[in-house]
Amino acid sequence: MKKWIVMASLLLAALPAMSAQRLKDIANIGGVRPNQLIGYGLVVGLDGSGDKVTSSPFTGQAMINMLNQLGVQVPPGTKIDPKNVAAVTLTATLPPFSKRGQMLDVTASSIGDAKSLRGGTLLLSPLKGADGQIYAMAQGNVVVGGAGASAGGSSTQINQLSVGRIPSGATVEREVQTALGDGEFIHLELQESDFTTANRAVQAINKVFGGDTARAVDGRLIEVRAPFDSNQRVQFLSRMENIAVDPADLSPLVIINARTGSIVMNQAVTLGSCAVSHGNLSVTVNNTPQVSQPNPLSGGKTVVTNQADITINSTSGKVVGLKGGANLSQVVNALNALGATPQDLISILQAMKSAGSLKADLQII
């Protein structure tokens, strides 16, 4: 834990202070955004690693429907064993301004009990948007980055085998209209809501284009007057998105991942003076089988019982005084002095926040 905190502090300490950034790096143009697509399909050509008919009956039904659509009549009541076929969900991202014929990458994820999608081919499948309309058609060979093997009841696996990617596997068939060329104004949406940054962005835009070209609606939204002609509007946006803006100073923030024990903090975090007592309590349970063997002629039965031994170990807590830290390196040194595990450190940081010693917002994900 100490090693990783020290490495993080060195990396963050090497970063320069908050400097000017391009407007395109801190704000998005309203209405210019990607759209998520989703679909359902069948991956065929698997070498016996597909779905099982007993646990994934929908795969067999999908195969029958597909064959019927292709003109192959399947007699009613026919059971199909889809061991070489896997049912998958398809996901893709439709970028803004996508045109018909543009290719998209597709991710295929097994929804049955297929062991692997390696070597499979996705059959032609529609990709729909949130409105239920078809925006792309997907088909192609599935590329799986993992590997696995099994023999004699033992198996090993590297990375995921039930998720694959189809590079350039979908073709855009429907375009999404944007409101970029409509109206007198366009809207800039800051990625992080902040009144200071919004005010500085407005001043920087008006300094370049003059007059009242831009005005702040709130801490996130900026309204900008733009030319009506599409070509002039593109030139205008090209100039505007490269304007340098000084963002507001970062708010002190500590982010904790409770599942992995990861802790990340920014350079604005400081500590107030406090004292922390830290100790550990561990409980160990050992089960030992005990066999009761009766005499041969007694008519009794052999009985196996478990004897449980429970041991509780407690390490004495120590009180560590933490001095107030004015920069990230001092905060890291103070936390390293505790000698706590990542999970213990989460509880300590929460207690320090409640005591008012941690001068930062605490966000647990």
Curated annotation (Swiss-Prot):
InterPro entries: Flag_FlgI. It is found in: Periplasm; Bacterial flagellum basal body. Keywords: Bacterial flagellum, Periplasm, Signal. GO terms for biological process: bacterial-type flagellum-dependent cell motility. The keyword Signal applies. Disulfide bonds: none annotated. Residues 1-19 form the signal peptide. The keyword Signal applies. It comes from the Bacteria. GO terms for cellular component: bacterial-type flagellum basal body, distal rod, P ring; outer membrane-bounded periplasmic space. Its main location: periplasm. Belongs to the FlgI family. Assembles around the rod to form the L-ring and probably protects the motor/basal body from shearing forces during rotation. The basal body constitutes a major portion of the flagellar organelle and consists of four rings (L,P,S, and M) mounted on a central rod. This is Flagellar P-ring protein 2. It comes from Chromobacterium violaceum (strain ATCC 12472 / DSM 30191 / JCM 1249 / CCUG 213 / NBRC 12614 / NCIMB 9131 / NCTC 9757 / MK). The gene is flgI2.
